[in-house]
């Protein structure tokens, strides 16, 4: 099988995870699951970035040791991913011993290339962004200096640090972007990066001496690595680096896809490839920067009190329901909005009505009238052949959308087919055909149910990456064995006469809790 290595960004565990984190994990998980079902050998890496001043300050404010806070909060992130059915192969933490070794080896390679030097740094630093800013990138607002880009407070910093010769990589980066147009996506982010790099790059401060929570610089333990050198290296660690002769590294590096938020595109599309070029390591194939998820159009924040807890949401509405909503509602790559009303509408309209009701009605008729066995169809009429052709052509379309990180379009294509299937079912009127004594009508009855069950089966196969548990239940109801669930099974028709289990509902309608009477 062809290897496929996909990663999420690693989150800062300085606070509790929110639905924005879940959005990235669910999207990346859907891609990983899709590739597995499409016969790829997938490695899926996620985790937490436990280093940096942000985590150290959060621990100091909480009055606990930094390592303890990082470990405790990382556990929360890992439990959230498990609760959302994220199928990662490794949950990395930047405090892991092998990650320290990987970070040090990357540093040594960049140093050996002559790209690291010691100098004094003075400038503005944002703890929240873990990033330096020059004067022109800041502004005074009510007596507080903030970054223009993110609106976060900055403090003046002066210390001796190591620098990376980022300025030497301007032309090499631009050449790579132009030679590899799919390296950065979507196009708006690619254009942003090219514009930024075209303006010329300054050398980058890559160590700190003002705190000690991080990976120590080789042979200079009074310095810790700038958090982004350490953090970005996690992608190499997850592939077995620094053992470049290992089977893991030779099989999975370079990464096929880094999935990140749009706010960290500069680190991934400018700094990271420059570090790798310096170290003589092949660059990842693609970086996709998704948009933000807002609450009713408003940015989520603790101060506003509108942060959505993804685990509580999944417990109330269902894990697969939340996964479907997040990937169906928002054009992936753009900013999107969450609301209670929108997710309930998707659950009741798309899942309960369009898919769940179609599966339930057709399978119930099979159970009641055909001894609970897959019907033996007659000759396909034009309407049957047209619907089957639409369903058969879905895999290629859906694959193209997933390869472009357009999961919303993949789901839209599947639901357009389900819309056609519901219209077909209504026009064919199997409930009327069932009552007829005509042999031709009975053949149409069996054929209609066969075609409906077959397109429901194909839909269930294709929604497995997004809704693995629910899709699995539908495939169970259709008598599909575990070895009949990869995408290779799309073209293998249901076998007439297959015994089916008693039908049960898969997607119940959501009814909001009613207040007690008299309230």
UniProtKB/Swiss-Prot annotation:
Record keywords, A-Z: Aminoacyl-tRNA synthetase, ATP-binding, Cytoplasm, Ligase, Nucleotide-binding, Protein biosynthesis
GO BP, one annotated term: methionyl-tRNA aminoacylation
Motif mapping: 'HIGH' region: 11-21
GO cellular component, as recorded: cytoplasm; plasma membrane
CDD domains: Anticodon_Ia_Met, MetRS_core
Amino-acid positions noted as binding ATP in the UniProt annotation, renumbered to this chain: 302
Subcellular localization, as worded in the UniProt entry: Cytoplasm
GO molecular function: ATP binding; methionine-tRNA ligase activity
Region (Disordered) location: 500-519
'KMSKS' region, short sequence motif: residues: 299-303
Catalysed reactions listed for this entry: tRNA(Met) + L-methionine + ATP = L-methionyl-tRNA(Met) + AMP + diphosphate
Family: Belongs to the class-I aminoacyl-tRNA synthetase family. MetG type 2B subfamily.
Biological role stated in the UniProt entry: Is required not only for elongation of protein synthesis but also for the initiation of all mRNA translation through initiator tRNA(fMet) aminoacylation.
Subunit record text: Monomer.
Protein name as annotated: Methionine--tRNA ligase
Gene name of this polypeptide: metG
């Amino acid at each position: 099988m062809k290897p496929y290595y996909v990663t999420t960004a690693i989150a800062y565990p300085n606070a509790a995870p929110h639905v924005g984190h879940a959005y990235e994990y669910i999207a990346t998980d859907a891609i990983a699951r899709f590739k597995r079902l499409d016969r790829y050998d997938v490695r899926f890496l996620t985790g937490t970035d436990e280093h940096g001043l942000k985590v150290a300050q959060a621990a100091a404010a909480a009055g606990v040791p930094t390592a303890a806070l990082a470990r405790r909060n990382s556990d929360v992130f890992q439990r959230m991913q498990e609760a959302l059915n994220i199928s990662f192969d490794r949950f990395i933490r930047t405090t892991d011993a092998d990650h320290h070794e990987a970070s040090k080896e990357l540093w040594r390679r960049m140093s050996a290339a002559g790209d690291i030097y010691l100098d004094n740094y003075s400038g503005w630093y944002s703890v929240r962004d873990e990033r330096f800013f020059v004067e022109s990138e800041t502004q005074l607002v009510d007596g507080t200096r903030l970054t223009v880009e993110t609106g976060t407070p900055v403090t003046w910093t002066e210390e001796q640090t190591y620098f990376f010769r980022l300025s030497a990589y301007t032309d090499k980066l631009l050449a790579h972007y132009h030679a590899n147009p799919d390296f950065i996506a979507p196009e708006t982010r690619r254009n942003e990066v090219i514009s930024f790099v075209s303006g010329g790059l300054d050398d980058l401060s890559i160590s700190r001496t003002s705190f000690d929570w991080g990976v120590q610089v080789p042979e200079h333990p009074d310095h810790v690595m700038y958090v982004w050198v350490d953090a970005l290296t996690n992608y190499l660690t997850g592939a077995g680096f620094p053992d470049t002769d290992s089977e893991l590294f030779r099989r999975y590096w370079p990464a096929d896809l880094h999935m990140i938020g749009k706010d960290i595109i500069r680190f991934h599309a400018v700094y990271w490839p420059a570090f790798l070029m310096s170290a003589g390591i092949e660059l990842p194939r693609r970086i996709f920067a998704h948009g933000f998820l807002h609450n009713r159009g408003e940015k989520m924040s603790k101060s506003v009190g509108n942060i959505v807890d993804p685990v509580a949401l999944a417990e109330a509405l269902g894990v697969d329901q939340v996964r479907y909503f997040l990937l169906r509602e928002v054009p992936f790559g753009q900013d999107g909005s969450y609301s209670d009303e929108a997710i309930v509408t998707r659950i009741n309209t798309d899942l309960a009505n369009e898919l769940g009701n179609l599966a339930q009605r057709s399978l119930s008729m099979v159970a009641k009238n055909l001894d609970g066995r897959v019907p033996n169809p007659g000759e396909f009429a034009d309407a049957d052949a047209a619907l089957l052709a639409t369903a058969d052509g879905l895999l290629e379309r859906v694959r193209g959308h997933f390869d472009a990180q357009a999961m919303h379009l993949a789901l839209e294509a599947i639901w357009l087919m389900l819309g056609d299937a519901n219209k077909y079912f209504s026009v064919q009127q199997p409930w009327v055909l069932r009552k007829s004594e005509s042999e031709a009508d009975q053949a149409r009855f069996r054929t209609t149910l066969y075609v409906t069950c077959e397109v429901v089966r194909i839909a269930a196969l294709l929604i497995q990456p997004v809704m693995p548990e629910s899709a699995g239940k539908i495939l169970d109801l259709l008598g599909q064995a575990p070895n009949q669930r990869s995408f290779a099974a799309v073209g293998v028709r249901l076998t007439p006469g297959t015994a089916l289990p008693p039908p049960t509902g898969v997607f119940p309608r959501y009814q909001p809790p009613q207040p007690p009477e008299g309230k």
